[in-house]
A protein has these predicted regions:
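Post-HExxH zinc-binding segment in Zn-dependent metallohydrolases
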Residues: 1-45
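Pan-zinc metallopeptidase signature
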Residues: 27-173
């Protein structure tokens, strides 16, 4: 459930940031807020994907290897992927969901009794896993991954931080 909670936390952080970043005059205009929020979510989603790809690169893996099921890929993942934390949930899965946040919100609305609270049933967990698998196939996400993998592959000086969010509320207060 880490990825589920993390995505909601980032969406809420982005909503609050978007609201506070507007002048008092613009805060009463829903369309201005909505546009600001969408732009900030794009920034957050791209940052999230960048951070997840840095982790995979560090582990000598890539998105294709961890998402396309084949005997070779399973062996590669079993050999190279090691973690003692929840980095996979907090970074890799969360980045997929952040880059598909509109459908994530729709999924939550459809599959939960209360929007924010995950309905903890085996069937709902299976639906959540299927939703994540669908995110892996999203052409928009794959396109962004390809762009970022090329950038990371060409860059020797990759940022060493693993900040979960690039938008920080203290920067505007």
């Amino acid at each position: 459930y880490e990825s589920y909670c993390e995505v909601w936390a980032r969406i809420m952080n982005t909503m609050i940031y978007s609201y506070l970043s507007l002048s008092n005059k613009h805060r009463s205009h829903p369309e201005t807020f909505r546009n600001t929020f969408k732009e900030n979510m794009k920034i957050e989603a791209y940052h999230s994907l960048y951070q997840s790809l840095k982790i995979l690169t560090f582990m000598d893996l890539n998105f294709k290897v961890i998402t396309e099921k084949s005997k070779d890929n399973i062996e590669i993942c079993n050999h190279l992927y090691r973690e003692k934390t929840s980095v996979f949930s907090y970074y890799i899965i969360t980045s997929l969901l952040m880059n598909n946040y509109i459908n994530f919100l729709g999924w939550c609305s459809k599959n939960n009794n209360v929007l924010l609270q995950f309905k903890k049933t085996p069937g709902n967990l299976d639906k959540y896993i299927e939703f994540i698998k669908d995110c892996c196939k999203n052409p928009h996400i794959k396109k962004n991954i390809n762009k970022l993998e090329k950038i990371i592959g060409k860059t020797d000086n990759i940022s060493k931080n693993l900040k979960m969010t690039i938008i920080e509320i203290p920067n505007i207060i």
